[in-house]
Design a protein with these regions (language model features):
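Bacterial N-terminal signal peptides that target proteins for export
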Residues: 1-10
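Gram-negative and organellar
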Residues: 24-424
Length: 424
């Protein structure tokens, strides 16, 4: 299976087993006890869980997502990684995750890459107050999303810092500042467009989240976010927006686990004569239910605005929906099947620009323009066998994309191969 198909399988597994990490932080010293109990190794103040993952070993039947004359290749991706924690009594916890994707293609040397990534987080517990900060860095050649078919080197950075306060035993409020940065190499082009011209961006903002614990396993929440996007080479894309999203969170031990947030976003471009406005529904949902301890059903749904690399269609509304089933067969075997659909509904620029990606001159567009919609489907099946701290699996994944306007955007792809995860 390729990296993108494996990421999808990982999302299915996450929906089946874990709540949303971003919106279900516990912020208490019990995490320190959990780290000391579950870490695989302990040396001095350091607790660590190293692992090695064979993300894929198999065949990609359409390496470049080509509409015609697809080219196949044998591929492998190996990822050594480690989680490291440093507890400080019961007052603080430092955590970092480091790893590298080693991507290899047998025939297409241009698709090979080394993709390092690291994340870190620190929490300081002061009775009812928790101070936290985290950050992440990824330098990768893997595809940015399901729109950009080119494997292009880019750097993603993110940082967050904030405070969570327990006002009562059941009610807490959290506020945080956010920063994100995306940078593509300057010589990377797709369809004649330099990706750095349309995608290099910096996002700053803050969020305020209130949580009310209804039961030990269920929490109601409301999150408000204010965001500002600035583009290095395309200032006409600069914008401000806010999101208001009520939601509910369930801990893993609940009958239903995961989280669901549904709300409203208002997107306001700084140059409203060029970029279209958007206001409407946004959502982040990932829920799972386990039947009789052996069959787990998962559902995911996401809807939000995402920037496009296209000059004349600067962003799209991404509607993603998925369903998955995991069935345990005895103590060691399991079977996972999933189906996902991603719909990208593009918004047209209010002005015309040259196809070079350098929007230096503009002219008004005359007449109505049909909305472009691209749909990507993915069907995945995997059989796994657990060995100690690891899992060996064989998977098959079929991808299909159609577009109502761009025939050359359509493709299909059958991928199959082996995955191995082992924790030391």
């Amino acid at each position: 299976m390729t990296a993108s198909s494996l990421r999808h399988l990982g999302l299915a597994l996450a929906a089946l087993t874990l709540p949303s990490l971003a919106h279900a932080q516990t912020y208490d010293a019990e995490q320190i006890d959990q780290v000391r109990k579950e870490a695989r190794s302990h040396v001095g103040p350091f607790y660590a869980t190293p692992r090695i993952t064979l993300k894929e070993l198999g065949v990609d039947s359409n390496v470049f997502n080509a509409a015609g004359q697809p080219e196949s290749d044998f591929t492998a991706t190996v990822t050594p990684s480690a989680d490291v924690w440093v507890p400080v009594a019961r007052r603080a916890l430092l955590q970092t995750t480091v790893g590298t994707d080693l991507v290899w293609y047998n025939n297409f040397a241009t698709e090979r890459s080394i993709d390092p990534h690291v994340t870190g987080r620190g929490e300081l517990y002061l009775q009812r107050i928790t101070l936290f900060a985290d950050g992440g860095y990824r330098n990768t050649r893997q595809r940015l999303n399901y729109e950009v078919d080119l494997r292009a080197r880019h750097v993603e950075q993110a940082a967050e810092a904030g405070v969570a306060v327990k006002l009562t035993p059941k009610f807490s409020i959290e506020t945080a500042g956010h920063y994100a940065d995306l940078r593509f190499d300057g010589d990377t082009t797709l369809d004649g467009i330099r990706l750095q011209r349309t995608l290099n961006q910096e996002t700053r903002g803050y969020s305020v989240t209130g949580r009310h614990r209804v039961t030990p396993l269920t929490t109601l929440a409301v999150r408000y976010e204010q965001l500002e996007d600035k583009f290095e080479f395309s200032p006409a894309r600069d914008s401000k927006s806010f999101r208001v999203m009520p939601g509910i969170e369930f801990k893993p031990r609940a009958l239903i686990s995961g989280s669901a947030y549904v709300g409203y976003r208002e997107f306001t471009p700084k140059n409203d004569g060029a970029l279209p406005k958007f206001s409407g529904l946004v959502a982040e949902l990932g829920l799972s239910y386990t039947l009789l301890g052996s069959t787990t059903f998962g559902v995911t749904y996401s809807r939000d605005l995402t920037y496009s690399y296209e000059v004349l269609q600067p962003f799209f509304i991404n509607n993603g929906v998925g369903a998955s089933i995991r069935r345990a067969l005895g103590r060691r075997f399991d079977v996972i099947v999933s189906a996902d659909r991603f719909e990208y509904a593009y918004e047209n620029l209010a002005v015309d620009a040259p196809a070079t990606g350098d929007p230096l001159t503009v002219a008004p567009v005359k007449g109505p323009i049909e909305q472009r919609v691209d749909k990507t489907w993915n069907y995945t099946a995997s059989v796994g066998y657990r060995i100690g701290n690891g899992r060996v699996g064989f998977g098959v994944s079929y991808w299909e994309r159609d577009s109502n306007q761009r025939v050359f955007r359509s493709y299909d792809n059958l991928r199959f191969g082996t995955t191995v995860t082992y924790g030391f």
